[in-house]
Amino acid sequence: MAKRQTNKRAAVPRIILLSDARNDAALERALARLPRGSALVFRHYHLPEAERHMRFIALKRAARARGIGVIGARIPPGWGADGVYGAATEIAGGTGLKLATAHSLAEIGAARRAGADAVLLSPVFATRSHPGATALGAVRFLLLARRSPLPVIALGGMTLRRAARLPVHGWAAIDGLV
């Protein structure tokens, strides 16, 4: 079940696009198709700092023009992201929307203690970004999601069709949204 939002929490998007080296060329087109209120998690770990900052500025401009939030992963606070993304230890103390990664019930608990607004629980299904990783599968994913005190975003091998079958707050993808 999707967790209800409280007034204390930042609005958690229902659709989240994660950036990486593989989908970079298609990001502007993907942003143009996302509904207002969605989010882009900017990662781009593969770029040198100066190039990474320039790419962040360009994508932030494109996203904001469409009413899409921009969440930063391991970026300096001065870049102007709308929030932070990463493991519980990486989001603790961050500002704005806090999206934590989780792969287990213990990590969901750590995310809650770190002040996360939501968890991206993964990998739900097999994924190209982590070949060979053991997927949770729909049943185990839903068991973990039901025990989560936070809104859950499904990540890992996600498509619109798969997302429609999972009764959680939302879904995220790297390849499934480009």
Q: What name fits each language-model region?
A:
Residues 21-22, 72-76, 99-108, 124, ...:
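Glycine-rich beta-to-alpha transition loops that act as phosphate-gripper elements at the mouths
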Residues 26-27, 51, 106-110, 140, ...:
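Short acidic active-site motifs
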Residues 29-35, 108-121:
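Alpha/beta enzyme core
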Residues 53-71, 90-105, 134-157:
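Alpha-helix-loop-beta-strand connector modules within alpha/beta enzyme cores
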